[in-house]
């Protein structure tokens, strides 16, 4: 931005923050896919996303986990499907100290995603980030379907988990 405006980059960023009253977001791309895979294979790694909703979010807000399965499991074979699912669900829950989520067992919360492993993939781009992933048939949160036959049907069965 600074280069485009002929300003010092820090000055341009501060001017933008003032002009937009701090309502500024940033989408950053860095690193190589080779490095992503190297970290992904580490035993202590969990899958997550730190994207925020609203405005024009990072494409992974709508497709981080579908990308994990479609790109890194199916296409690149960096992980097995079982290992990826474990890192996305139970391992992540255990890391956060949440024992009643991330796996299916009596007394646990019934959060389930039913997908076609041969079709699941993220579709969001930096230009159009708010696209739902392909290949997801059902999403069931606390026993209620919020995606049915691939279509978002709404609902607010999820809850904020206090750590």
Show which residues each predicted segment covers.
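His/Asp/Glu-enriched, well-ordered alpha-helical/loop segment
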Residues: 1-19, 31-117
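Short catalytic-site patches enriched in acidic/histidine residues
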Residues: 21-29
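Short Gly/Pro-enriched turn/cap motifs at secondary-structure boundaries
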Residues: 27, 60, 129-131
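Residue-level detector of alpha-helical recognition elements and their boundaries
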Residues: 28, 99-100, 107, 122, ...
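C-terminal cap of metal-dependent C-N hydrolases
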Residues: 38-44, 49-50, 64, 113-159
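Short beta-strand-to-coil "C-cap" segments at the C-terminal boundary of structured domains/repeats
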Residues: 162-163
């Amino acid at each position: 931005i600074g280069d485009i405006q002929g300003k010092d980059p820090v000055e341009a960023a501060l001017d933008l923050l003032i002009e937009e009253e701090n309502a500024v977001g940033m989408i950053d791309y860095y690193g190589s896919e080779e490095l992503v895979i190297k970290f992904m294979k580490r035993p202590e790694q969990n899958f997550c996303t730190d994207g925020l909703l609203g405005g024009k979010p990072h494409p992974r807000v709508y497709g981080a986990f579908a990308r994990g399965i479609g790109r890194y499991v199916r296409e690149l074979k960096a992980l097995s499907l079982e290992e990826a699912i474990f890192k996305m669900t139970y391992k992540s829950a255990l890391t956060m100290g949440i024992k009643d989520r991330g796996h299916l067992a009596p007394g646990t919360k019934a959060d389930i995603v039913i997908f076609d492993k041969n079709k699941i993939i993220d579709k969001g781009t930096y230009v159009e980030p708010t696209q739902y992933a392909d290949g997801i048939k059902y999403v069931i949160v606390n026993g209620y379907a919020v995606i049915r036959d691939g279509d978002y049907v709404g609902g607010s069965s999820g809850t904020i988990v206090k750590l």
